[in-house]
Amino acid sequence: MTKEEKLARKQQRKAEKVGLGKLLLWNSSSCSVALSTLMLGYATFYCTDVLQLAPALVGTLFMVSKIFDSFTDIVAGFIVDRTQTRWGKGRPYEIFMLFLWLSTWLLFSCPTSFATAAKCIWIFCMYTFMNSICVTFLNANNVVYMVRAFENKEQQSKIVGYGSIFTMAGAMVFNVLFPTAMAKVGTDAVGMIAIPLTAIGMLRILTIPEKFTPVSEKNGEQTHLKDLLPLLKESRPVLIICMVRFVQNIATGLGVGTYYWQYIIGNLGMMGVASVTTILVLPLAFALPVLRKKFGMAGMSVIGILVGCIGYLAT
């Protein structure tokens, strides 16, 4: 290898490098959003056991909210795509992090003295604003922000790949601590973690600017709704992905794990203790790139589904 080739390779590695500090700062927002989403798993339990609302009524409220969410996803994407500010295109929407945790705290702070109708209005408004507005915009801006903060695909791949490890670690810590805190101090646990997680979630908007313009934007390319409709109609893989996400949202939104530990096991605090075992999965995250090369994404998906089914059947 010539001296010029060595220099070129060194410069390439330098261009592809993402420092640990920037990696943590970027994923601070994603981790905060993920933890707020995990907290929604306790919303059904809170509504039925604390507010004494009928399970069928709670399910109906959440179902209507999810239907509304399907429309806000489309609207948020088009709003973000057409944004032009001095802070950039995707970065300004990180401000929804403040409203996300405010609405999360309010969701679990409904006065128990309210009448049933008032409780329903409170829960529906807070749940919808949190999930259908705040989380939607924080998801819609994510890729738009990333491609303007990191210029090359190698950096973007590292941000997504290694960043998921930090998000997974944060979720594990949450799953261990939050059920125990809920068992001891009730819904006050939400307020205890809302402030620090808001601060963590705001690190990205305060430290990482948008510095680059994607090629598609330089060429003046824009996505229109009429371009998406034929894709949904003719592309079978897209329809399959939509169905998978639909089933996934139903399964994750049930929140049955809380009921299982409270009424079958008899101790909600033990849910956090049992979650300690999930730390065994963390080293596997470092092996995912190798496994993905060996089995492919389809093979990895099948393996994950089979392992998940075995786990659910065993419990």
For each feature predicted by the language model, list its residue ranges:
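Membrane-embedded alpha-helical bundles of multi-pass transporters/translocases
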Residues: 7-221, 225-315
